[in-house]
Regions:
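N-terminal Rossmann-like NAD(P) cofactor-binding subdomain of oxidoreductases
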Residues: 1-192, 228, 292-293, 297-302, ...
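Charged docking surfaces used in two-component/phosphorelay signaling
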Residues: 70, 159-340
Length: 340
């Protein structure tokens, strides 16, 4: 008899939490019961899931009693407060915030890249940053085959990565611009409509933004600390899906066609690479889909053993919600739903 589990979604009414609910609804996970948790103001909200009505409860320590797996997207503060309490109550936590990503005690996992890191988990598993996830899904097969030496990444990140208020700000500014009205900027320090901002998260003393350092440090933890890497992260006026320009230098020589064949054969990746017929990954096409789309694969002629690649994925799905559910699937498959 297949063991059934009680799942909790924390931050169930947010952008990512909504995606989590939707992905769980169509998943093959053996879910016996679903607990929906959110801030106190949202407690009592009714939500339909698999044809039944569920009532959202307040996120607190006692809410995790009887829960086997909690997937959390409620922010760093809530994660730091609630995750240890959930583990004390026998619940495995998959956390989408920054709270535990760089802790050596907690695995930082992308199932297509380093699922084996789950084996020795201590009750809390961290979900990586959205921009890191799609990049490493694309880099993993190249690294396994040709050994990556260096990566230069520039991102073009959708406003939904900043939350629903940012999506609404883009919509409102676009409407105001079309009607000749003054644009109001509240979520971002500058107008985002018809603009690009080389500014995601706070700036650090080294001149990098926190988002840029997340990509660098998470790559070292997940894929290989020997890879040299630099990043520039940019917010663009797109609602959903992050795009990335990747420049990759490898130790071993390669043929471009072999890289394309490798991409086609790799889990979680869809190759869209026929530029002569205007076929390449687009943010608007990736929205609502699970794959990491790659294309524009071509040799970098400026140095030996280097290539360029364009990579696009839905930041709310593979960049957040889907990856957490895939981690849960790995835990169930490997019989790792347990706490110390």
């Amino acid at each position: 008899m297949i063991k059934q589990y009680t799942f909790a979604v924390v931050g169930a009414l947010g952008n990512v939490g909504t995606e989590m609910r939707g992905i769980l609804e169509t998943s093959d996970l053996p879910i016996e019961n679903l607990v929906l948790l959110d801030i106190a103001q949202n407690a009592g909200t009714k939500v339909k899931w698999r044809g039944e009505e569920y009532t959202v409860a307040e996120s607190n320590s006692d809410a995790f009693s009887g829960v086997d797996i909690a997937i959390m997207s409620a922010g760093e503060g809530a994660s730091l407060e609630l995750s240890p309490e959930a583990v004390k109550r026998g619940c495995v936590v998959i956390d989408n915030s920054t709270a535990f990503r760089m802790s050596q005690e907690h695995p930082l996992v992308i199932p297509e890249v380093n699922a084996d890191a789950l084996e020795n988990h201590q009750g809390i598993i961290a979900n990586p940053n959205c921009s890191t996830i799609q990049m490493l899904v694309a880099l993993k097969p190249i690294h396994d085959t040709y050994k990556i030496k260096r990566v230069i990444v520039s991102t073009y990140q959708a406003v939904s990565g900043s939350g629903q208020a940012a999506v609404e700000e883009l919509q409102n500014q676009t409407h105001a611009f079309a009607n000749g009205k003054q644009l109001q900027a509240e979520v971002y320090p500058h107008q985002i409509a018809f603009n690009v901002l080389p500014h995601i998260d706070v700036f650090l003393e080294n001149g990098y933004s926190k988002e840029e350092m997340k990509m660098i440090l998470e790559t070292a933890k997940i894929l290989d600390p020997k890879i040299k890497m630099t990043a520039t992260t940019v917010r663009v006026p797109v609602a959903t899906s992050h795009s990335e320009s990747l420049n990759i230098e490898t130790e071993k020589a390669f043929e471009v066609e072999d890289i394309k064949t490798l991409m086609e054969a790799s889990p979680g990746i869809e190759l869209e690479d026929d530029p002569e017929n205007n076929v390449y990954p687009l943010a608007i096409n990736a929205a609502g889909k699970n794959a990491v789309f790659v294309g524009r694969i071509r040799r970098d002629f400026s140095t030996d053993n280097a290539l360029n690649m364009w990579c696009v994925s839905d930041n709310l799905r593979k960049g957040a919600a889907l990856n957490t559910v895939q981690i849960a699937e790995e835990l169930v498959k490997r019989n790792l739903v347990r706490v110390p």
